[in-house]
Amino acid sequence: MDLLSIECVSKPGNIWRKVHGKIAKKPTNFSWLIDNKLAGSGMPTSISEIDWILKQGVRSIITMTENSLPESWVKNIKYLHVPTEDFSAPDMQQIDEAVEFIQNRLKNNEPVMVHCAAGIGRTGTILACYLIKYEKLSARDAIQKVRKERPGSIQSESQEIAIGLYYKFLN
C-alpha cells in the first residue's frame, strides 16, 4: 500500500481528493493568491496532478501535511516539507522557514504552491504569514485577504493565534 493509499484509509477527506484527482487530473482547491506567483492548493494525489501544477507555472512546492510528497514526484522542483498536524499551526521557526522559502523562490522567478490536505487551514496560515512579512499587512488584514481569495481558509483558533504571533514576532 502506498503513502497516499494509507492516508486515504486514515483520513476520509483524502478519498475525495484521490477521486477528484483521477477525474479532473488536478488537485482540489488550487488558486493563485498572488497571480502567477503564490498559490494555495489541496494535496496532489498523483504524478498527473503534479504535471498539471507544473503546467500552471509552479516551480516550487511547500507541503504542510504530516507526510511529504513522494520524492519521485518532486525531484525536478524546489521542495520544502513542513510537517504539521491537521487543524494545528506550525511553530514560529517553521512559519518563518516557509515564508523565507517562498520569498527566495519568488526572487528567482519560481512561482510557489503551498498545500496541505484540503488547502485551507495550514495552507492559509502560511499564505497569511507571507502577506504579513512581505506585503506588510496586519494579521487581521492578511487573514481577511486570504479568506476572501480562498474561502474557508485558516480553520482553527490555533492557526489564527499563530498568524497573530507571527505578526508580533516581526514587529
Q: Model-found features: residue ranges?
A:
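Ser/Thr-glycine-rich phosphate-binding loops at phosphate-binding pockets of nucleotides
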Residues: T123
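Conserved G/P- and acidic residue-centered "switch" motifs that form tight phosphate/ATP-binding loops
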Residues: G119
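Short cysteine clusters
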Residues: C116
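Cys-dependent protein tyrosine phosphatase-like superfamily
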Residues: M1-V112, A128-N171
